[in-house]
Structures are given as C-alpha cells and as structure tokens.
A protein has these predicted regions:
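Sec-dependent signal peptide recognition
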Residues: 1-7
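N-terminal signal peptide c-region/cleavage motif recognized by signal peptidases
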Residues: 10-12
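Histidine-rich, glycine-flanked metal-binding segment
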Residues: 17-20, 27-73
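His/Asp/Glu-enriched, well-ordered alpha-helical/loop segment
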Residues: 276-359
C-alpha cells in the first residue's frame, strides 16, 4: 500500500514533464526540415520535444500559438552594439545601440557586431556589453585595431595587424566569430587581404564591407579571387555593385563566387540596400545567404527599421517564407560557425521567435526612397531566450488578473 501511495503522489510530476509547451503553431525549422504544425516543449533553457500533439496535461504552462509561425530565434549577423567607453571614440559614440533595447521585440536572440571594435578596444566591448547583455552577442574583430573609431583611421595600414587580431580572436573564441574589413578607400585590397590573413590564423570567416567601388580593385576580383569559401560579402545589394547583367539576370561572376562558397549578406543599413539590385536578383532566385540589418541608430529610424521589416521586404520580392527564415536563422548561424544556433530541436537551446504573418497592403522602402508593395508582413508576437519569455506582444503568456493565481509582493 505504501508503494502504491508513493506512485500515486508521483503521478502529477510524471504527467507534467514539461515546464512550457507552445501549442498549435506552424514550426519552420529549415535546419531540421520541419515546416508543419507542431507543438514545442521546453524544460529549463532547452527544447525538450517537438511533436505533432503534446498533451496539454503534460505541461505546467501551455501557450496557444495556433495560427502563428514558430521559428528559431533570429540571428542578425550585422548589428552595431558597441558604444565604447569613451564618449565619441567609437562607432557607438554616435550610432550604436544597446542590444537588449531592440533585439527581443523583433524576434532576435543573437546579434553579431561586425567590427565596431578592434584588437585595441575589444576587451572593453566584452566587459561592458557582451558579458552583460541578455541578448547573445558575438563579435567580429575589425582588422583595424581602433575598430570603427573613424573611417579615416581605418585607412592606417600600420594598424592592420593580422597576428595581434588573430591572437585576440583565439583568446576569445567563445564570442569572437570572425574578422571584419570595412570602409577601405585605397585602390588596392590591403585591408581585405590583412583580414583574410587574420581569418586564416584564427580559423574564422571574414566579412567585408567593400566600401567604395574603384576600378583599380574590382568587386568581381574580391569575390572570385580574394575571399575564401565561407567568407562573406556584406551590403550585397548596394548600388552601384555590378551584380546584374544587361538582361537583368545575376552577373556570371556572382554565380561563380557563390559556387566557390563565398556568402552574400544583406547588411541593409542606412545606405546599402537598393531595390534596383535586390528585386531582380531575388526574382531570379539569387537569394541572400543571410538577411541582416546593419542596425544602428540611423538605420533603425529610417528605411531599414528592424529585422522583421527587412525579412518582409524579401517576402514582397518573392522570396518564399521558408527561405526567408533560413536566411535569418540557420544560415547566419552556420556562417559564423555556430551551427548549434538557429534551430528548434530536442536538446537545442530554446531561443525561439513567434511571428504573425499579417495580410494586407504594405509598402517598403530602400535607402534612397524606392518603394515596393507587398501583401504580407511579419510581426513579432513572442520571443524566448534560453527558455525564458523575454517579449510577449499580446500577453499570451499571462492569466486574467481577476481570476488568475497571481503572487503580489508583500507590503
């Protein structure tokens, strides 16, 4: 009898084996080839199960997400979040933002800062931002030791140090995921070549903001000869890059570069996204490998706005929703060698975004005021970071205050 009593007492614990279940949503997880209505169970910081029908009785808390899309937490690999510790001394002195201010409300759980800091100031960046943010923040080191202190200072060849940069990247390999070359003005590839050298030494990819398009250093040469497989060309739809041939199709060199394994990142930003390139290439099936924002205080208050808006632009140009999610989750995670991110699978960290695909008539802008229209847009409904609900747009996780079992603070 005593044994039976013990077993009966244990039944509720056995029955409620999950802390949380997101129930009835349409899961899109490109990495694991899931594109169907599924329930997602979570225990602690991890995904515990993904299945067609998890009984509600097995969960302590159930959130109805029927009619919504459940995706891996968005990975934005181009967002400037380093504001510096000395006023006016880095990109952030004027235009970077604190990651938690905008990440979760847009479904983003991981941000990669591409080159706001270099080997001279990265330790401060890690101490003040990376280690304190609730958002997962990763970084690419600028090959210029001063980072984005000023574009003029990024031209100093004596500050482009592959050995020191690679050494720091190896020392912080848990958060440093690449090397960045940016804003190079000279008629040569020195900055890019130094970044590639550092990337080889540290075994990490390189991201290049090509800067000015000079005939002495053709963009075609960079993506077909200078960059390695796995390296990334950001601002990939920035005019006047010669990406479209006379018939409106992808230029042959672009196809060759992709075949080599070079990755193309959106990096929308405040001046680097033009429908004149993006629409014909997207309609031709040349989708970006990664969709990213180039988020900073100017771009977030201009045409770019945020990650869901940027993703919605590609929906409006004809990119299928599954491919938009792929380019915003598993692809960028893989590009920065963090393949464990960007997925919803048993045992994976429970970084999850829940979106509503709103129907209507919507307009979207590029950086010079060009407009397209589309019938859909993504709206963030909920975000979970490591199993915790960190954003809940419509209060789906709450209970009615009049009848719910709520705990009020003691007087």
């Amino acid at each position: 009898m005593r044994i039976i009593g013990i077993l009966l007492c244990a039944l509720p614990a056995i029955a409620q084996q999950y802390e949380l279940v997101l129930k009835g949503g349409h899961v899109i997880d490109p990495k694991n080839n899931v594109n169907a209505v599924r329930d997602v169970a979570i225990n602690g910081s991890r995904v515990a199960a993904v299945a067609p029908d998890i009984p509600a009785a097995q969960a302590r808390k159930v959130i109805n997400v029927q009619g919504l899309y459940v995706t891996p937490g968005i990975v934005d690999i181009h967002a400037h979040v380093w504001a510096g510790t000395r006023p006016g001394t880095t990109n952030g002195g004027q235009s970077s933002f604190y990651p938690d201010h905008l990440s979760f409300r847009t479904g983003v759980t991981t941000m990669v800062d591409p080159g706001s800091s270099g080997w001279r100031d990265f330790p401060d960046f890690r101490r003040t931002i990376i280690d304190r943010a609730r958002t997962r923040v990763l970084a690419m080191l600028n090959i210029a030791g001063v980072g984005i202190l000023a574009y003029e200072l990024e031209q100093n060849v004596h500050d482009l140090n592959p050995e020191v940069t690679a050494k720091l990247a190896r020392e912080h390999k848990d958060v440093v995921v690449g090397i960045k070359s940016a804003h190079w003005w000279a008629p040569n590839f020195i900055s890019v070549q130094k970044a590639v050298e550092a990337g080889k030494l540290a075994d990490v990819p390189v991201m290049v903001d090509f800067g000015y398009f000079l005939k002495e250093r053709p963009y075609q040469t960079m993506v077909t000869d200078v960059l390695r497989p796995g390296d990334m060309s950001t601002h990939c739809f920035r005019w006047p890059a010669p990406l479209v041939d006379g018939s409106g199709k992808p230029a042959e060199f672009l196809l060759q570069a992709r075949k080599r394994g070079v990755k193309f990142d959106v990096g929308h930003g405040g001046g680097s996204f033009h429908f004149r390139l993006a629409e014909p290439l997207t309609k031709a099936g040349f989708y970006p490998d990664s969709i990213s924002t180039d988020m900073h205080t100017q771009s977030m208050n201009a045409a770019m706005q945020d990650m869901p808006t940027t993703m919605s632009k590609f929906l409006a140009m004809g990119m299928p929703l599954v491919e938009v999610i792929r380019a915003s989750t598993t692809n960028p995670a893989t590009q920065v060698k963090r393949p464990e991110l960007g997925q919803i699978a048993d045992g994976a960290e429970a970084d999850i975004a829940v979106f509503r695909l709103e129907k209507g008539n919507f307009s979207y802008l590029d950086v010079i005021g060009g407009r397209i229209e589309g019938p859909e847009r993504l709206v963030t409904e909920m975000t979970l970071r490591a199993g915790r609900i960190v954003f809940d747009y419509n209060g789906r996780s709450g209970v009615p205050w009049r009848t719910g079992d709520l705990k009020y603070p003691e007087k």
